[in-house]
Amino acid sequence: MKKKLEKKLETLEHRDKKYSKIRLNIKPNREGSKIPIKVNDITFNYESKEPLYKNLSFQIANRERFLIVGQNGVGKSTLLKLILGKLKPTNGNIWYGNKTDIAYYAQELELLDLNKTVLENIDKKEYSEKELRTILGSFMFYKDDAFKKTSVLSPGEKARLSLCKILLEKANLLILDEPTNHLDPETQRIIGENFKNYEGTIIVVSHNIDFIKQIDINRLLILPTGKITNYTDEKLEKFLESTKE
């Protein structure tokens, strides 16, 4: 038993070293605005329902890591859709810096064309096929994986491909809605390094403590109260503990 465990640990260590050699160093196409986005006194409700939030205001600084948390149904994903312009606030407005470029990861994995291969889904003219396959390697797609039809991928594989795709957009503001939902802890840790090192602003909805710690969150927005505070692990853990039944 001991020998088997030692062999497994040795294999994992070797694999981690292999992954670390191909981590990405992709940068945004341009530096973002000093203030990429301001949410100004917004209220939002779906038709004939109570407002999800009233008079919510905040602004985000360039390269900030901003975390949104709350129980199910309080409007976390809705707030992201308001920021993206997919929904309009009932009152108030959202302002964008003139250098703000946005890329969005949806937990529904809607970014992917299921009729294309893995490689075709991330095809960018600025990269050669060899470069693209190296990039795919940093998201744990190897060799013939590049030619798999996206429709046959598992949810975890689709999530990895979607995360790869949004990084290749080279936007200076990444909006991530539960990016680790389909990932096992080891995969999340490896892929999370690509976001930890990204030289842009990140707004993320997540309850994955390991991922949150990994990408160095600066501030925390708690819904539905709208309370904003500087991030600490203790504050997040206290909030998560308060939501347990």
Predicted regions and their residues:
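Flexible nucleotide-interacting loop at or near the entrance of a catalytic core
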Residues: M1-L52
